[in-house]
Regions:
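Vicinal oxygen chelate
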Residues: 4-12, 39-42, 56-120
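Conserved short beta-strand elements that form part of the metal-binding/catalytic scaffold
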Residues: 28-63, 109-114
Length: 120
């Protein structure tokens, strides 16, 4: 048995990134390792993103994190009302139908859903 468990990404400021991922995406803190300037954040399905502060400037180098949501348009409306800023609003692109945000370090965060991807 093999299961993809977590993804580790370097960040410039673990506190700032922790706040952004919990407040914006609703991820919850699984655990923190304060002496290593690291935090593990988990989604509702149990997948974790491990954020680790690094001493050098972070280069996202085209990295994108994809989150499946129940309804892209509803999520966009709800999150926009909460003040979340999107880099791209709901639209069809080469990868399907969704929206895009950018985290404090420049990583692209894409939200999509299967239903609207098939319909649009």
């Amino acid at each position: 048995m093999m299961k993809f468990d977590h993804l580790s990404i370097p960040v410039n400021d673990v506190g700032r990134s922790r706040e952004w991922y919990t407040a914006t995406l609703g991820l919850r803190v699984e655990f923190e390792v304060l002496d290593r300037r690291s935090v593990a954040l988990q989604d509702s399905e149990g997948f974790a993103i491990f954020l680790q502060e690094v001493p050098s400037e972070v280069d996202p180098n085209g990295c994108a994190l994809w989150f499946q949501v129940a309804d892209v348009d509803a999520t966009f409306a709800d999150w926009s009302a909460r003040g979340v800023v999107f880099a791209l609003g709901p639209q069809k692109s080469f990868w399907g139908y969704g929206v895009e945000l950018v985290d404090p370090d420049g990583y692209r965060i894409r939200l999509w859903d299967e239903r609207t991807m098939r319909e649009k």
